[in-house]
């Protein structure tokens, strides 16, 4: 299996005046996302690192097949496409919950079977919402001089949610 390699810029490194932070905290945007995902209300993450991130993939970088943490959905905004590679691949509904993994399906994806893997074209400005906790997904290896830059937005179903310190330590190298 290919190892993951990329850089993550956490929310606390962005100015409150940055376009990404303004979009994230803009009530009409959050209301729009709530309607799409079928939630009556969504709340900003209270974690200092997780609300808004930018994932940076340079030449040779990629993400391995993985699930996101146990959230209702994953939302990403493509900021800049790679010169080559950096393709988003998704194997939908490879599990129905953290405890209910379809091992045959997962094994087929990890062994290279492509019949149930979807390739999602990502152009700058494109917003993608998917069930990252239930769908195995990855980004293929990036090539060329131009980095692939993608924003990730984390909203919660209840107010005041702080992310898992183990996840923060693993992803950002620090807890807060």
List the predicted regions and their residue ranges.
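A short hydrophobic beta-strand segment most commonly corresponding to one strand
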Residues: 74-77, 129, 145-160
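Signature of the catalytic double-stranded beta-helix
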Residues: 1-49
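Aromatic-acidic/polar surface patches that form glycan- and anion
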Residues: 22-25, 68, 120-121, 144
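Ligand-binding loop in jelly-roll beta-barrel domains
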Residues: 123, 139-150
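Glycine-rich nucleotide phosphate-binding loop and flanking beta-alpha elements
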Residues: 136
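Residue-level signal for alpha-helical context at structural boundaries
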Residues: 51-52, 93, 106, 143, ...
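Double-stranded beta-helix
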Residues: 155-176
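Catalytic core of non-heme Fe(II) oxygenases with the double-stranded beta-helix
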Residues: 31-39, 44-49, 55-129, 133, ...
């Amino acid at each position: 299996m290919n190892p993951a390699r990329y850089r993550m810029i956490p929310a606390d490194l962005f100015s409150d005046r940055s376009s990404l932070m303004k979009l994230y905290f803009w009530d009409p945007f959050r209301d729009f996302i709530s309607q799409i995902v079928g939630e009556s209300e969504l709340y900003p993450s209270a974690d200092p690192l997780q609300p808004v991130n930018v994932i940076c993939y340079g030449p040779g970088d990629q993400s391995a097949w993985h699930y996101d943490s146990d959230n209702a959905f994953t939302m990403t905004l493509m900021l800049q496409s790679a010169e080559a590679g950096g393709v988003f691949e998704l194997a939908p509904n490879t599990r129905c919950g953290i405890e209910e993994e379809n091992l045959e399906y997962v094994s087929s994806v990890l062994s290279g079977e492509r019949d149930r893997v979807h390739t999602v074209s990502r152009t700058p400005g494109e917003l993608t919402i998917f069930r990252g906790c239930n769908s195995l997904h990855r980004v293929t290896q990036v090539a060329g001089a131009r980095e692939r830059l993608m924003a990730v937005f984390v909203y919660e179903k209840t107010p005041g949610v702080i992310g898992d310190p183990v996840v923060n330590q693993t992803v950002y190298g620090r807890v807060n």
